Design a protein with these regions (language model features):
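N-terminal accessory interaction module
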Residues: 1-8
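Conserved active-site and SAM-binding loop architecture
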Residues: 8, 13-198
Length: 198
């Protein structure tokens, strides 16, 4: 895979291809084959030697799908993702995360117990403790609950209390001050009655 970088240079990443993929020499579907080989690989490809470190916190981490995507994106641009924190209230999903990203501090807890301050307020003792355990954060990723924001089968959930969990992402960004923040959600989140996007 070749990725064009902002400075005009290129970063290359490689995946060992299966015999089946090697037989198909067409360009059609090449990206899908590349991604499929990556997802099916028994061992993850290595990062380039001397790759710069990108420290990542994943809130509402689940089993780590967003972290996996960011891991591959970092590898594609010759960087090395270092997961420093994964938080999710689902212990089973977090166990899967832990098996895929062994170095991360994984905390099976509702995020509001760890990031408990209001936006704009001083850092709380709980938040200070969490930050001291993880150090610097370069990228914050997360997918707060989207059921209350979805237009599918949604008649009463626009006022669901879980919709406010979106603000925990903003609060963590405020206190950890990452360089980049990626929040995944449904597009209808913009219509939330609590104006969580604003």
């Amino acid at each position: 895979r070749v990725v064009a970088l902002r400075d005009g240079s290129e970063a290359r990443s490689y995946i060992p291809l299966s015999r089946e993929s090697l037989r198909d020499r067409s360009q059609a579907g090449l990206a899908e084959r590349f991604d499929g080989e990556f997802l099916r690989a028994a061992v993850r490809p290595r990062h380039a030697r001397g790759a710069r470190e990108v420290r990542v916190a994943d809130l509402f981490a689940g089993c780590g799908v967003m972290s996996l995507g960011l891991w591959e994106a970092c590898r594609a641009v010759s960087a090395r993702m270092v997961p420093v924190l994964a938080v999710d209230s689902n212990e089973v999903a977090l166990a899967v995360y832990r098996s895929n990203f062994a170095g991360a501090l994984t905390i099976p807890s509702p995020i509001e117990r760890l990031v408990d301050g209001d936006l704009g307020s001083p850092v709380t003792a709980t938040e200070r403790n969490l930050l001291s355990r993880i150090g610097r954060v370069d990228v914050l990723i997360g997918g707060p609950p989207c059921q209350g924001h979805s237009n599918l089968n949604n008649h009463t959930r626009r006022i669901d209390l879980k919709n406010a969990l979106y603000a925990r992402m903003a609060r963590f960004a405020e206190i950890a001050q990452p360089t980049h923040v990626v929040i995944e959600n449904v597009t209808a989140v913009r219509h939330d009655r609590g104006r969580v996007v604003d």
